[in-house]
Amino acid sequence: MAVKIKLQRLGKIRTPEYRVVVQDARTKRSGKVIENLGIYQPTQEPSLIQIDSDRAQYWLGVGAQPTEPVLALLKITGDWQKFKGIEGAEGTLKVAEEKKSKLDLFNEALAEAADGPTAEAITEKKRKAKEEAEAKAAAEAAAEEEAAAKAAEEAEKAEADSEGEAEAESAE
């Protein structure tokens, strides 16, 4: 009996999903299946390919012939190279990044909410008033710094004068 490893189509229109199956070569695509080896979902990014490597190796060893699309999938997963005995030729299967769990996303949202709103809903008038208030605050801060610097200079001069007077008195 001639056995083939085929793709059996599932899914809705324009959303194909496939099973990688072992069937008699003469059966139709959706016919009786000898064994289900895995799944293939080309619509995901990257495509989801899950093939039971041990069973695929068994069926290839028994003489099952893969169709062209299945052969391409077996090369991607590295099963074909393993069957042929090609050294150092692993598959090029891309794995999707793991999604964050809903609990982690919820905790992040709580942390952001605890920090307070990041953007304020303000009108144009309030924005101008806010900008003017910020400018005033900056000007006041600069004036305070200048006043503090002048006071420090006067204090240094006063200390220097008092030291100079003390030295003059001790010299007399």
From Swiss-Prot:
This is Small ribosomal subunit protein bS16. The lineage of its organism: Bacteria, Bacillati, Actinomycetota, Actinomycetes, Mycobacteriales. Gene3D superfamilies: 3.30.1320.10. Pfam families: Ribosomal_S16. One of its GO terms (molecular function) is structural constituent of ribosome. GO terms for biological process: translation. It comes from Corynebacterium jeikeium (strain K411). Belongs to the bacterial ribosomal protein bS16 family. It comes from the Bacteria. GO terms for cellular component: cytoplasm; small ribosomal subunit. The gene is rpsP. Residues 147-160 have a biased composition (Basic and acidic residues). HAMAP family: Ribosomal_bS16 (MF_00385). Residues 115-172 are annotated as: Disordered. Residues 161-172 have a biased composition (Acidic residues). Keywords: Ribonucleoprotein, Ribosomal protein.
